């Protein structure tokens, strides 16, 4: 049976901001994102992680992507990487990143805009004894996982954020089969990968290991544009990083993220229209929604 995500539920589950705190109190995120072909994805997901409340957000990417992101979001910390032949992060640099983050207990956000480098990057960053406090896997990281390009030994506190096409590849189904039983698909993802699964779409579903399924009623067709998912992935990672510091769960982070993302889109559509709104417009509305919840 599906449970509805409500405003009051999100208000209770959101990580709080404490007077006696510092940036270390709210966790950190390493976003392995972006490539020469997909630079904007890194900008959107890193800002999403910061807006989601993470104390520190690091971006690992190639230098042109780093330059773009820092010009837009100087609050982000840079981990510049060499460019591989495919335009993405060089796998040797991904190995170095894993070692550098070994004792930092960061949340890994992998996938947005990684392109063809995703398989090598995820193989280097994930696998047995990965150092991450949690992980959010999206986009190209999900496709690499579905193709068996890296081990399925995912860190504890992992969240997958597939759209129906990615979910179909992860489960070995067709998209019509996923859409015909979205709840069953979400539960199967959570059980197969031992993680929280966010099945995006009209009325996004959040499934946790054990069978609990949450249904989100916020959001609209204005989100059907490239970049919306990058923001959701970043927002989820930021909420996960901050929440783990306060005893929250990956399920809590995913539930809050999908509701906030959709609620921001609903407010944005009233300002911009569903047709004209852009994913980047959501940040203004997200701040307004969070402000209402904090009061």
Where are these regions (language model features)?
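Small-residue (G/A/S/T)-rich helix-start motifs and N-terminal tracts that mark the onset
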Residues: 1-134, 143-159, 164-295
